[in-house]
Structures are given as structure tokens and as C-alpha cells.
């Protein structure tokens, strides 16, 4: 086998290798009559990827010499990735790339012809192997989305790089929703922030899916395919079925085809039933346990409803000690105690009978302005001696 890649196609080949490196540790290289096939699969057999470069992609392509059988080989991904490690270098200095496969020496030779007559030769050892092929049929999937890779790439940009899985579903109004997925038994601190992105139907070239369907798959492999498709300015098609069935991601061009098959989780029903509705995250049952206001009462945005909502959101924290923050008002002129003020102080506790939660948080958060502050540190120090007139 011998092929020659020139011009900008060298960088395209390098980007494809980078995308495959996100999935597997071994690269299966197979010359075919239809083109050069690069495939990989992860160790758990839950992700499979394949790129098929047509003969027109190469300036020169020969699958096998006359009278010789087609060779199939398997090499380490790190070894082949080291040839295309720097994409910037490929674009600026490499003019053409020659790949040859010699079965007698068991070597895969990759030559990079750079500017100023510089040549870099990589001799990679390989192993003979059988053909790696996954069984899948995109036409059998009832749901399909097609959109420019740039649109989907911008949609996954806000998600954390440490996020493992993402949920893709169809919400109300036929909106396509991407939401971060966290396992139920995971630490509560990891679920503190949920990222969700919504795309309108007009952003897709084709949207053939029912409302309420959703699948959850690995985000790392999905980003690898998006990175390649976006750099090549290609459209991405997503074919999927029910949760638990594999999802198929395809890109197609006159010079290359790409297929990524990713496993999906089978327990996403509880996460997708209210996809796109933020009301499911509000602690409404806890609020009704303390008071049963009219549904329109919270539209007034008064201080009592605000403090009730605060009480329900942090009520589960128990007896955790809150940090003390000094918010005492500035110096005020002393007021002489009078009978009128004493009557007001005695009448003040009776103004909120039967509403312990609001009274509790009023004294906790707003006690410095709504109630007299009683310092537990004892009497304040005497700053001036008593006058002689007072006995």
C-alpha cells in the first residue's frame, strides 16, 4: 500500500487522527479499494469510530501492488499520533505526506516532506490483525438530527471539560436540549451546577424526532468528532433510538466519510421526562409544608415570601453554624426611653403570630434593622463616669 497526501489534506488527516485518539489506544489501518480506512474502538467496546478517505482525497493512492493481498495492520495510537502531534506545524511546514505499508518488513513508513527540502521519516511497527467492523445501520433509527457542526460545537462549549456524559433530548416546542448528566449516587456537591443549552428547530437542517425522547452518551468522544467536523466545515447527523440503544454520528463528504457509534445509558427516563422545564428543580413540596399560599401570592415579591423561600431552600442544612458577619448600623443619637416606645416594643412580638419561619429569618438576616440587637457578651464598658448630680 502506498498513498500520497498533499496540501491542506495533510492537516485534515492529522485532525482525524486526533479525533480517533480520544476513543481508543490502538489504530486499525486497512487499505481498501474504496479508500484508506482508519478505525478504533475503546477498551470497553462502548465507542467505535471510523474514517474512510476516498481515493480522490490522495494525490496518489494504491491499495496493493498487483498480485498482492490487501494488508490489515494494527498500531499503537500514540505512535501514529506522534507523527501528527502539532497541527500548526503540519499546516505551516509540511507540503506532503507519504504513507507506505510494507508487509515483509512489518513497518509502516510515514514520510513528511517539509519546506526547504527537509524530510522526516517515521518507521512504525505494526501487527497483523483482522478487519475491525461494527454492526450498525443508521437507517433503522427512528430519530435523526442534522445540523452544521459549528452549531453543535458552540452548544457544548459551556460544558465543563470534566463532564463525562451529556443528555441530548427534544423538549417542549421541539427545542433540542443539551443538559449535563450526573449520576444519582454521586456526591451532591458535584450536582450543584447543571448546565443546559437549548437550540431552536430553525438551527437544524433536519429534525425528525418526537418530543420527550432523550439519550445520554459520553461527551469526550462527541467533542472529538465535533472538533474534526467543525474544522472541515461539515454537517453532522445524529441517528438514535431508545435509551440503551447505540447512537450513530455521521459526517459525509465527497472525499471522506466518518462514523462514530457511541453507547447510551438506559436509565435516562427520569431525567428526560421534564427536559427543558426548570420548574422540576424548585423545592415546591417543601414550601407547601410550611404554608399554603394562594398561587398568585408569590407574584407580589414581598419580603415575607422571600424569607419563606429562603427558609425552604436551606432548611435541610440542619444545625450548621453560619458565619457571623458584622452588619451593625452606624452610630445613632441616643433616644430617651419613653412610655410610647416601651408600648411599641411590647406590641412588636405580637405582630407576627403564627408565622415562625418568617420571624426566625427576620431576626437572623435582618435583626440589625428590624429588631433590637442584644449582645451576648455582657454589658458594654463604661465610657464616662456618672455625674455628681445622679445619686
Curated annotation (Swiss-Prot):
Keywords: DNA damage, Exonuclease, Hydrolase, Nuclease, Nucleus, Phosphoprotein. One of its GO terms (molecular function) is double-stranded DNA 3'-5' DNA exonuclease activity. SUPFAM superfamilies: DNA clamp (SSF55979). Residues 268-301, 319-391 are annotated as: Disordered. It catalyses: Exonucleolytic cleavage in the 3'- to 5'-direction to yield nucleoside 5'-phosphates. The modification Phosphoserine is found at residues 272, 277, 328, 341, 375, 380, 387. Changing residue 341 to A: Complete loss of phosphorylation and no loss of interaction with the 9-1-1 complex. Abolished phosphorylation by CK2, preventing interaction with TOPBP1. Coiled coil: none annotated. Its EC number is 3.1.11.2. GO terms for cellular component: checkpoint clamp complex; cytoplasm; nucleoplasm; nucleus. Residues 266-391 are annotated as: Sufficient for interaction with ABL1. Residues 51-91 are annotated as: Possesses 3'-5' exonuclease activity. Component of the 9-1-1 cell-cycle checkpoint response complex that plays a major role in DNA repair. The 9-1-1 complex is recruited to DNA lesion upon damage by the RAD17-replication factor C (RFC) clamp loader complex. Acts then as a sliding clamp platform on DNA for several proteins involved in long-patch base excision repair (LP-BER). Component of the toroidal 9-1-1 (RAD9-RAD1-HUS1) complex, composed of RAD9A, RAD1 and HUS1. The 9-1-1 complex associates with LIG1, POLB, FEN1, RAD17, HDAC1, RPA1 and RPA2. The 9-1-1 complex associates with the RAD17-RFC complex. RAD9A interacts with BCL2L1, FEN1, RAD9B, ABL1, RPA1, ATAD5 and RPA2. Interacts with DNAJC7. Interacts (when phosphorylated) with TOPBP1. Belongs to the rad9 family. This is Cell cycle checkpoint control protein RAD9A. It comes from Homo sapiens (Human). The gene is RAD9A.
Amino acid at each position: 500500500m502506498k498513498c500520497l497526501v498533499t496540501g491542506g489534506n495533510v492537516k485534515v488527516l492529522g485532525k482525524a487522527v486526533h479525533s480517533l485518539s480520544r476513543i481508543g489506544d490502538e489504530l486499525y489501518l486497512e487499505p481498501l479499494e474504496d479508500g484508506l480506512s482508519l478505525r478504533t474502538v475503546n477498551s470497553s467496546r462502548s465507542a467505535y469510530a471510523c474514517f474512510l478517505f476516498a481515493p480522490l482525497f490522495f494525490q496518489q493512492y494504491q491499495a496493493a501492488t498487483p498480485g498482492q493481498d490487501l494488508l490489515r495492520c494494527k498500531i499503537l495510537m500514540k505512535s501514529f499520533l506522534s507523527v501528527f502531534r502539532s497541527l500548526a506545524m503540519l499546516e505551516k511546514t509540511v507540503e506532503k505526506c507519504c504513507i507506505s505499508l510494507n508487509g515483509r518488513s512489518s513497518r509502516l513508513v510515514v514520510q513528511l516532506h517539509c519546506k526547504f527540502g527537509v524530510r522526516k521519516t517515521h518507521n512504525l511497527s505494526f501487527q497483523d490483525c483482522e478487519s475491525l467492523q461494527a454492526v450498525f445501520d443508521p437507517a433503522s433509527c427512528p430519530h435523526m438530527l442534522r445540523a452544521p457542526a459549528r452549531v453543535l460545537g458552540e452548544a457544548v462549549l459551556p460544558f465543563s471539560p470534566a463532564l463525562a456524559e451529556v443528555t441530548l433530548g427534544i423538549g417542549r416546542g421541539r427545542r433540542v436540549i443539551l443538559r449535563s448528566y450526573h449520576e444519582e449516587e454521586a456526591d451532591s456537591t458535584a450536582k450543584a451546577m447543571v448546565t443546559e443549552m437549548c437550540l431552536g428547530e430553525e438551527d437544524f437542517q433536519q429534525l425528525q424526532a418526537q418530543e420527550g425522547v432523550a439519550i445520554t452518551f459520553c461527551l469526550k468522544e462527541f467533542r472529538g468528532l465535533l472538533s474534526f467536523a467543525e474544522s472541515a466545515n461539515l454537517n453532522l447527523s445524529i441517528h438514535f433510538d431508545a435509551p440503551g440503544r447505540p447512537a450513530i454520528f455521521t459526517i459525509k463528504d465527497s472525499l471522506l466519510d466518518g462514523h462514530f457509534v457511541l453507547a447510551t445509558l438506559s436509565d435516562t427516563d427520569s431525567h428526560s421526562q421534564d427536559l427543558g422545564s426548570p420548574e422540576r428543580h424548585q423545592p415546591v413540596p417543601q414550601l407547601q409544608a410550611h404554608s399554603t399560599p394562594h398561587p398568585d401570592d408569590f407574584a407580589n415579591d414581598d419580603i415575607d415570601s422571600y424569607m419563606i423561600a429562603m427558609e425552604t431552600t436551606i432548611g435541610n442544612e440542619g444545625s450548621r453554624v453560619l458565619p457571623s458577619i458584622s452588619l451593625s448600623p452606624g452610630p445613632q443619637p441616643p433616644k430617651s426611653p419613653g412610655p410610647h416606645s416601651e408600648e411599641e416594643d411590647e406590641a412588636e412580638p405580637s405582630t407576627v403570630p403564627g408565622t415562625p419561619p418568617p420571624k426566625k429569618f427576620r431576626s437572623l438576616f435582618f435583626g440589625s434593622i428590624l429588631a433590637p440587637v442584644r449582645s451576648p457578651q455582657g454589658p458594654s464598658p463604661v465610657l464616662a463616669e456618672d455625674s455628681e448630680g445622679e445619686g
